[in-house]
Amino acid sequence: MDQTLSNFGNVFAFLALGVVFVAGGYLTARMLRPSRPNPAKNSTYECGEEAVGSAWVKFNIRFYVVALIFIIFDVEVVFLYPWATVFKQLGEFALIEALVFAGILVLGLAYAWVKGDLDWVRPTPNIPKMPEMPSGKSGALRG
């Protein structure tokens, strides 16, 4: 029990020192840096060209879906790499565990594919319009 607490104490001390070093560096830089704002420093820099328009551009949500799927499978590789290095020592049970892990991810990919989340060009939905009222007003209900 003492050895386990000692190991957790080492991890906690390592994390605490990491936070102290990051916060200390940030605070030291903030206190020592000169503050001389001017229009040239506050403008957006784009490869030496003057910025045109707004930087807030709407991106298609499909880019995010593709990026998330890439990250999921990239993390899968990170998890499977250590397993692959000691594959012969772990035996059959570890192989089954890795196959189940990969299978769950493949099922998730198949679900996203069947749902249509991976289709780059989606058909526009055909939404029927409300019939117009005889008085010329739209389909709003009157009370």
UniProtKB/Swiss-Prot annotation:
State the protein's name.
Answer: NADH-quinone oxidoreductase subunit A
GO cellular component entries: NADH dehydrogenase complex; plasma membrane
Catalyzes what?
a quinone + NADH + 5 H(+)(in) = a quinol + NAD(+) + 4 H(+)(out)
Subunit architecture: NDH-1 is composed of 14 different subunits. Subunits NuoA, H, J, K, L, M, N constitute the membrane sector of the complex.
Q: Name one GO molecular function term.
A: quinone binding
Which family does the record claim for this protein?
Belongs to the complex I subunit 3 family.
What topology does it adopt in the membrane?
A: Multi-pass membrane protein
The role this protein plays is: NDH-1 shuttles electrons from NADH, via FMN and iron-sulfur (Fe-S) centers, to quinones in the respiratory chain. The immediate electron acceptor for the enzyme in this species is believed to be a menaquinone. Couples the redox reaction to proton translocation (for every two electrons transferred, four hydrogen ions are translocated across the cytoplasmic membrane), and thus conserves the redox energy in a proton gradient.
Does the record carry Transferase as a key word? Answer: no
Question: Where does the protein end up?
Answer: Cell inner membrane
EC number(s) reported in the record: 7.1.1.-
Task: Kindly give the Pfam families that the UniProt entry links to this protein.
Answer: Oxidored_q4 (PF00507)
Q: Which UniProt keywords apply?
A: Cell inner membrane, Cell membrane, Membrane, NAD, Quinone, Translocase, Transmembrane, Transmembrane helix, Transport
State where it is primarily located. membrane
- Membrane-crossing residues? 8-28, 63-83, 93-113
Q: What InterPro entries does the record point to?
A: NAD(P)H_OxRDtase_bac/plastid, NADH_UbQ/plastoQ_OxRdtase_su3, NDAH_ubi_oxred_su3_sf
